[in-house]
Amino acid sequence: MARTITFDIPSQYKLVDLIGEGAYGTVCSAIHKPSGIKVAIKKIQPFSKKLFVTRTIREIKLLRYFHEHENIISILDKVRPVSIDKLNAVYLVEELMETDLQKVINNQNSGFSTLSDDHVQYFTYQILRALKSIHSAQVIHRDIKPSNLLLNSNCDLKVCDFGLARCLASSSDSRETLVGFMTEYVATRWYRAPEIMLTFQEYTTAMDIWSCGCILAEMVSGKPLFPGRDYHHQLWLILEVLGTPSFEDFNQIKSKRAKEYIANLPMRPPLPWETVWSKTDLNPDMIDLLDKMLQFNPDKRISAAEALRHPYLAMYHDPSDEPEYPPLNLDDEFWKLDNKIMRPEEEEEVPIEMLKDMLYDELMKTME
């Protein structure tokens, strides 16, 4: 028996089809009747967990901030609640995209299509163009993975799902850092940078570059590069390809347990990519960029802005059309609160009423 899904939305939208469901949200395609434009409407029911409310506020604030960026999904409209007491669900109207990179890669493996080197270049360029802008605003996305990269038939790519993103304190350093912060719910394991598992002292925008490198490799081979079953297996797979960390890189690791684990592994040289994939016809520029993205030490990893200038992306690189954004205003009450939360248990101490007020205020703001 079919389950009924209720969307309490204005009459100018006509629901068409269910697109997807997640832990606390449902997405349907719809038509904006006055214009005939197809849209996606996301229904979020975040109030079962404070964590979901903070993610929802983050998502709305950041998508507002990056509104109209060609490679970041846009919120076109929000359904304003009648009152805060009637706020039981959040409805966001977004651009409708046809698929995501995960589905495209899966289809490639099923023999339906093959990603050409041109496709791989263009998708990589668009991911990095988005990351340059995100990082310039001193934001780390923290969940870059194929299913969060939406695509249409023109091969336009848009980054979505900013619910896990974090804002960094202002700094004159170009490689922004978030000192000491980590939670158990960041980043899908296969795309997770080694510093997250090894508790380096600082977490930086380089985390997103590692994820982008994993995705570049997956587009080339059609298979996840580091499909770890658990923490130890993930680390084993990374070191199997990158080789044993240098003494300098080893000393960046702060976790005593992680250091002992790595010290007890056999010494290994890095594997050539031709060996990793059993391929000999690899684009040398792609290999060079991949090496620069997948540096074990985040300080040695290429930045998004540097990667856009790499020869592999020369066909698309246009310095006049790769925007930077000013840093977010961290005096905003939500960002001040968000940046104080260092552990999940601290999130639980925040009154749900305060978070609901912040979410309501965000929904009542006009679209700019």
UniProtKB/Swiss-Prot annotation:
From what superkingdom does this record's organism come?
Eukaryota
Q: Which co-factor is required?
A: Mg(2+)
- What would be one Gene Ontology cellular-component term for the protein? periplasmic space
The reaction(s) catalysed by this protein are: L-seryl-[protein] + ATP = O-phospho-L-seryl-[protein] + ADP + H(+); L-threonyl-[protein] + ATP = O-phospho-L-threonyl-[protein] + ADP + H(+)
| Regulation of activity | Activated by tyrosine and threonine phosphorylation after pheromone treatment or carbon/nitrogen limitation.
Phosphotyrosine modification sites?
A: Y185
Q: What else is known?
A: Present with 5480 molecules/cell in log phase SD medium.
Return the PANTHER family for the record: MITOGEN-ACTIVATED PROTEIN KINASE (PTHR24055)
Q: How does it assemble?
A: In the nucleus, KSS1 forms a complex with DIG1, DIG2 and STE12; in contrast to FUS3 the interaction of KSS1 with STE12 does not depend on DIG1 and DIG2. Phosphorylated KSS1 shows reduced interaction with STE12. During pheromone activation and phosphorylation, KSS1 forms a membrane-associated complex with the scaffold protein STE5, the MAPKK STE7, the MAPKKK STE11, and the G-protein beta subunit GBB/STE4; interacting directly with POF1, STE7 and STE5 proteins.
Q: Which family does it belong to?
A: Belongs to the protein kinase superfamily. Ser/Thr protein kinase family. MAP kinase subfamily. HOG1 sub-subfamily.
What is the recorded name of this protein?
A: Mitogen-activated protein kinase KSS1
**Gene this protein is translated from:** KSS1
